[in-house]
Structures are given as C-alpha cells and as structure tokens.
UniProtKB/Swiss-Prot annotation:
<dbReference type="InterPro" id="IPR016428">
    <property type="entry name" value="QueF_type2"/>
</dbReference>
<dbReference type="Pfam" id="PF14819">
    <property type="entry name" value="QueF_N"/>
</dbReference>
<keyword id="KW-0560">Oxidoreductase</keyword>
<dbReference type="InterPro" id="IPR050084">
    <property type="entry name" value="NADPH_dep_7-cyano-7-deazaG_red"/>
</dbReference>
<feature type="binding site">
    <location>
        <begin position="256"/>
        <end position="257"/>
    </location>
    <ligand>
        <name>NADPH</name>
    </ligand>
</feature>
<comment type="similarity">
    <text>Belongs to the GTP cyclohydrolase I family. QueF type 2 subfamily.</text>
</comment>
<dbReference type="InterPro" id="IPR043133">
    <property type="entry name" value="GTP-CH-I_C/QueF"/>
</dbReference>
<keyword id="KW-0963">Cytoplasm</keyword>
<keyword id="KW-0671">Queuosine biosynthesis</keyword>
<dbReference type="GO" id="GO:0005737">
    <property type="term" value="C:cytoplasm"/>
</dbReference>
<comment type="pathway">
    <text>tRNA modification; tRNA-queuosine biosynthesis.</text>
</comment>
<comment type="function">
    <text>Catalyzes the NADPH-dependent reduction of 7-cyano-7-deazaguanine (preQ0) to 7-aminomethyl-7-deazaguanine (preQ1).</text>
</comment>
<dbReference type="InterPro" id="IPR029139">
    <property type="entry name" value="QueF_N"/>
</dbReference>
<dbReference type="InterPro" id="IPR029500">
    <property type="entry name" value="QueF"/>
</dbReference>
<dbReference type="GO" id="GO:0006400">
    <property type="term" value="P:tRNA modification"/>
</dbReference>
<dbReference type="Pfam" id="PF14489">
    <property type="entry name" value="QueF"/>
</dbReference>
<dbReference type="GO" id="GO:0033739">
    <property type="term" value="F:preQ1 synthase activity"/>
</dbReference>
C-alpha cells in the first residue's frame, strides 16, 4: 500500500463508485488527481528529474453534427508530465460519454473543447488530435523496441513491490541499449482492478542485470498505483540504483473504458516519436 492511498484528494473520485452516465456535454465530470501525491512519496521536489507526457488514446469518441448525424473519431491526447494534475480515467470516460448526444458545429469545435476542458483539469495546456476511424484501420500493430527480457529461466516466489531488486544490479560494462517487458502488471489504486502493460526501457550507462530488472518489474504485480505513478516510480528507482547517463521509460497499458494510457518519462525526450499500438491494445 502506498503512503497516500487514503489521501483526502482521492476520496471524492467517482472511481469505484456507482455513477450515472450523462449523454449531454458536461465538463464538470472531469476530475483531477494531484501528481504531488506520489511525487511526495518519491521525495521529488519542484525540479523534476524527468520530462515527458501521458499519451492517451480515445477509442470511444462520438458526438452529433448539426444535422444530428452521429460522428465517430479516435482521439490522441498528450498531458505534459509537468502538469500539476493527472486526469482520473473513469471521470475522463464519463466526460467523453457526455459528448454522445451533444451537437457540435465541426470536428475543430470538438478538438477545441477537449483542449480547453482537459487543460483546465490538468492545470497545463494539453495537446489533442482527433482522427477519422479509417486512419486507425491502416495503423500496424507493432512490438516495443529493443530486446525482450521476459524469456528467462528463473523462479519467482515474491510478488510484493521491492525496489531493492535493483541494488547492485549494474556491471562495469558501459552500454547503450533498449529493453522491454510485457510482464508489467499493477492494480488500480482505488478499485484494485488489474492494470496490464508493457514497458520499454532505453538507457545509456552501466549495463543493468536483466534478471534483477525483470524481478523488479514483476514486483509491481500486487502493487496499487495509477499507471502514471508506476512509470515515475520505475524511472526514479532505475535512476537511484543504476545511475544511467540517460534514461527513457515508456509504458503502454491495455485499454479500459475505451481509453488506453501510455506514460512516457525521459531524461531528455519530451514525447515518444510515434503513438503505435501493441498487440494487446
């Protein structure tokens, strides 16, 4: 359990509660969660050790045009990691549902509305793009970059989070490499529902022991935090124990409620080059 599980800021969230679905535009449905909750737990100050963003894909985005004809689109949203708040995912889903029976004059108006409301919730300007469904029908399914570390003949008998797996995990060999794992699984901070993800780790520095890294990632299996918080924990733990010269951590989670969340944290990159789907997305 994290130190902030019972924080007052979490008690008013609709997540985990029975809610009424609204079908006409209602921006008040959006709920913010202060990023400071887990960053205080990680002893992060105002000067963050990373940059990056949270990339959301919106698969259930629909509204009515001026003639009442339903429109559908796929949206992509990027929330800067520097924003004071993250957007709680169930409230995001409920907010998007409120578009369903609302008339908009154009696709641009929908985009402008999303930018305005999400930026107000996050506390910083949010980037939004919306695309026709046809664009996504042509998008390939890809794998993460680098080598997969999952196929190791090791025994796992501990599934409690333990950053100490990364202690003494580097050698004297300097390397620049990209590794990935599909075994990332954590649980929702509020509901305990499982969150399934894949994570890509790109670094330059002392070579990291792959067995220890995999044991560390598997230790999230019973851990309760939001997606964004897990990725920031992975980033800060690798920096603490492995001290690479540069580091990028990118996780892509399976969708829930028509949304997938893909947190990206880096020592030097503001955003991933592409937003491409994995097999489980």
């Amino acid at each position: 359990m994290t130190k902030y599980t019972n924080a007052d800021e979490l008690k008013s969230l609709t997540l985990g509660q029975k809610t009424e679905y609204k079908h006409t535009y209602e921006p008040e449905l959006l709920q913010a969660v202060p990023r400071s909750l887990n960053r205080d737990d990680l002893a992060l100050g105002d000067e963050l050790p990373f940059v990056g963003c949270d990339v959301w894909t919106l698969y259930e985005l629909s509204w009515l045009n001026q003639n009442g004809l339903p429109q559908v689109a796929v949206g992509e949203v990027a929330l800067p990691a520097t924003s004071p708040n993250l957007v709680e995912s169930k409230s995001f889903k409920l907010y998007l549902n409120s578009f369903n029976q609302t008339k908009f004059t154009s696709w641009d108006e929908v985009k402008e509305t999303l930018v305005k409301d999400l930026s107000a919730c996050a506390g910083e300007t949010v980037k939004v793009d919306i695309f026709p469904v046809q664009r996504y029908s042509q998008q390939p399914i890809v794998d993460m970059q680098g080598e997969c570390i999952d196929d190791q003949d090791i025994i796992i008998d501990d599934y409690e989070f333990n950053a100490a797996y990364l202690e003494s995990s580097t050698s004297d060999v300097n390397i620049e490499e990209t590794l990935h794992s599909h075994l990332l699984k954590s649980n929702c901070l509020i509901t305990n529902q499982p969150d399934w993800g894949s994570v890509e780790i790109q670094y330059k520095g002392k070579k990291i022991d792959r067995e220890k890294l995999l044991r560390y990632l598997i230790s999230f299996r019973q851990h309760n935090e939001f997606h964004e918080q897990c990725v920031e924990r992975i980033y800060t733990d690798i920096m603490k124990y492995c001290a690479p010269e540069s580091l990028t951590v990118f996780a892509r989670y399976t969708r829930r409620g028509g949304l997938d969340i893909n947190p990206f944290r880096s020592s030097h990159l503001l955003a991933p080059k592409d937003n491409l789907r994995l097999a489980r997305q």
